[in-house]
C-alpha cells in the first residue's frame, strides 16, 4: 500500500491537510461569497428595519407635536370660552340687577300713586261729607228760622239746590 494512503504515515496526513486546504480555498471562496451575500442581505434587512423604525419614530414625533399643538389650542380656546362666559355672566347679572331695580322703582311709584289717589279720594269724600253735613245743617237752621215765619217757596228751592252746589 502506498505511503500516502496509510494513516500511520506522515505523508497521509500531509496529503489530507493539502486536500482540506485546497477544499477550503476552492469552496471557501464560493462559501465566502455566499456568506458575504447572506451577511449583506441581513445587514440590508437590519438597515431597512432601522430606517423604518426611524421613519416611524419621526412620524410619531410629528403626531405627538401635532397633538400637543391641538391640545394647547383646545386649552387656549377653553380659557377663552371661560373668560367670555364669565364676562357674559357679569353682564347678565348687571342687567338682571338693573331690571330688578327698575321694577322695584316702578312698583314704588305705582304704590305712591295709589296712595296719593287714595288720599285724594279720601279727602274728596271727607269734603263731600262735610259739604253734605254743612248743607243739612244750613237747611236745618233755615228751616227752624223760617218755621215761625212764612216759608217762601223760593227759599225752599234754594235750600234744596244748596247741597248739590256745595259738592
Swiss-Prot record:
It is found in: Cell inner membrane. The keyword Transferase does not apply. The chain crosses the membrane at residues 8-28. Pfam families: ATP-synt_B. InterPro entries: ATP_synth_b/b'su_bac/chlpt. GO terms for cellular component: plasma membrane; proton-transporting ATP synthase complex. GO terms for molecular function: proton-transporting ATP synthase activity, rotational mechanism. The keyword Plastid does not apply. Keywords: ATP synthesis, Cell inner membrane, Cell membrane, CF(0), Hydrogen ion transport, Ion transport, Membrane, Transmembrane, Transmembrane helix, Transport. Its main location: membrane. It is a single-pass membrane protein. Belongs to the ATPase B chain family. F(1)F(0) ATP synthase produces ATP from ADP in the presence of a proton or sodium gradient. F-type ATPases consist of two structural domains, F(1) containing the extramembraneous catalytic core and F(0) containing the membrane proton channel, linked together by a central stalk and a peripheral stalk. During catalysis, ATP synthesis in the catalytic domain of F(1) is coupled via a rotary mechanism of the central stalk subunits to proton translocation. Component of the F(0) channel, it forms part of the peripheral stalk, linking F(1) to F(0). F-type ATPases have 2 components, F(1) - the catalytic core - and F(0) - the membrane proton channel. F(1) has five subunits: alpha(3), beta(3), gamma(1), delta(1), epsilon(1). F(0) has three main subunits: a(1), b(2) and c(10-14). The alpha and beta chains form an alternating ring which encloses part of the gamma chain. F(1) is attached to F(0) by a central stalk formed by the gamma and epsilon chains, while a peripheral stalk is formed by the delta and b chains. This is ATP synthase subunit b. It comes from Phenylobacterium zucineum (strain HLK1). The lineage of its organism: Bacteria, Pseudomonadati, Pseudomonadota, Alphaproteobacteria, Caulobacterales. The gene is atpF.
